[in-house]
Regions:
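Short, tandemly repeated low-complexity microdomains enriched for cysteine and small residues
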Residues: 33-35, 58, 64-69, 101-105, ...
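Aromatic-anchored, glycine/proline-accented short structural segments
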Residues: 146-197
Length: 284
């Protein structure tokens, strides 16, 4: 029932300042502004490729203010979309799952989804903006057994476990799976990463926050342009290879550069390399 990764919601102190920074590094533009009752926030919504990043400023007491007080600026909510919100509601009500409907968005609390605050929006076509193509992954870091989480998500969202692709990394210290929604047509998924130690950054994060939302990933159709933006701004990022000035594939932008958001970036199709379909990776 989930079509794709649709958006993220980011808690910020100053949305105008954050919007300028995201535009500088990612070529995003402001699409609109509104208010969220559920989040207790004024939202500045950025068009980032085909996806949207919601910059959320606290508007009095509520979830956004609580997040900022507890964690500071950063990634607050993972967003996905479905073609039929009402069918999703019926599914959850049949399972006895609590949710909140705020205008045309459905929210699940992190207590329901293993530390992963989730918002579901209705699927809609949006023209691509800038050098980013789309958001395709949000990472649910886990102390809980990933197999249990995968089974729960399959039930909650009507996902097919036969499409999932197991993952693991000694470099980053985790095991888990990618809950791919529609392979091989699209990369969209929730990454379930159960940490294997508390030495690596991901493990340290889970030691502090428990089951949680860690980061997100975008695909770019013009990595050279994004890389150039990062270098021109002297923004801290870790390339997939050894040379930040010439790396052909992508990398990770440090949270301090994007108001607390740890952002992974990969060139077109590269992520199939670790998503169970290496044959789909285009050559550079």
């Amino acid at each position: 029932m989930l079509d794709r990764c649709d958006r993220v919601q980011i808690a910020v102190h100053d949305a105008a300042k954050a919007a300028q920074r995201f535009g500088q590094l990612l070529g995003s533009i402001v699409a609109r502004r509104d208010h969220s009752r559920h989040l207790g926030a004024r939202r500045t919504i950025l068009a980032v490729g085909e996806s949207e990043f919601e910059l959320c400023e606290a508007d009095g007491a509520g979830l956004t203010q609580d997040f900022l007080a507890r964690r500071g600026e950063g990634l607050m909510t993972a967003g996905y979309c479905t073609a039929d919100l009402d069918s999703m509601v019926k599914r959850w009500e049949g399972l006895g799952v609590a949710y909140d409907r705020d205008a045309e968005q459905l929210y699940l609390s992190p207590e329901t989804t293993f530390g992963l605050p989730i918002v579901i929006s209705e699927s809609t076509y949006r023209p691509r903006v800038g050098p980013v193509s789309f958001l395709y992954e949000t990472t649910n870091t886990l102390a809980t057994n990933w197999r249990r989480v995968a089974a729960v998500y399959a039930g909650l969202f009507g996902l097919d476990p036969a499409r999932f692709s197991e993952i693991g990394s000694e470099r980053f210290g985790y095991v888990g799976t990618l809950t791919l929604f529609d392979p091989p047509n699209r990369l969209d998924r929730i990454e379930l990463s159960q940490v294997t130690d508390d030495v690596h950054a991901m493990g340290r994060f889970v030691k502090t926050h428990g089951d949680s939302l860690y980061m997100c990933y975008v695909e770019v159709h013009d990595w050279a342009a994004v890389r150039g933006r990062l270098l021109e701004a002297n923004a801290r990022y870790t390339p997939r290879g050894s040379d930040p000035a010439t790396d052909p594939d992508g990398g990770w932008v440090h949270p301090k550069e994007l108001h607390g958001l740890l952002l992974g970036i990969s060139r077109t199709g590269l992520a199939w390399d670790w998503s169970g379909r290496e044959e789909l990776v285009p050559s550079v």
